């Protein structure tokens, strides 16, 4: 891994006020952690930092930080940006020793076209990064996962991956990294039979929505039997 040189200056003032004044000067506050020393508070040019990590390693880029004549190896670990302007406001660095391994997150990249995708499956990446332990100058750019033989319903776990030379995976061995999911079938609703205009409702069925109820006192149709308990009209009144 190539090293990029980054210059910074020590800062003695801390807090929101001094940090604001630094940004007005075109610099940002930063902190260097790690090692056996107390954290070092520095100020640096954000544009220079962003340019320094324009490498395939991104955040895992090994940097040589020069602070007032002293030099130390660091990794860019964290940052804060303005939510509106997206400008870099603060940075954190991890000081490392070239002969001591470090743990970092390395991105996962799939290689090839899964056999299950050709069968209609959907390739899903469950772990977008894996924790790797390696010397600072041996940190890999990415973890490549060959998915060519992966069929529908199958998955690859961390235990099935080969770690890059000089690296160890520090991750759950049974963790699923990538899998091919079975596509979901769309449920088709059963067709609803349309009502036939003028058809009489089934016996005991309620009238259709919007149908008018018979008018009160309306006479039944000719020949119709009177309602139960009702009085017949137009017939004999019975023998005396």
Curated annotation (Swiss-Prot):
Gene3D superfamilies: Ribosomal protein L25, beta domain (2.170.120.20), Ribosomal Protein L25, Chain P (2.40.240.10). Keywords: Ribonucleoprotein, Ribosomal protein, RNA-binding, rRNA-binding. One of its GO terms (biological process) is translation. One of its GO terms (cellular component) is cytosolic large ribosomal subunit. Signal peptide: none annotated. NCBIfam families: bL25_bact_ctc, PRK05618.1-2, PRK05618.3-3. This is one of the proteins that binds to the 5S RNA in the ribosome where it forms part of the central protuberance. This is Large ribosomal subunit protein bL25.
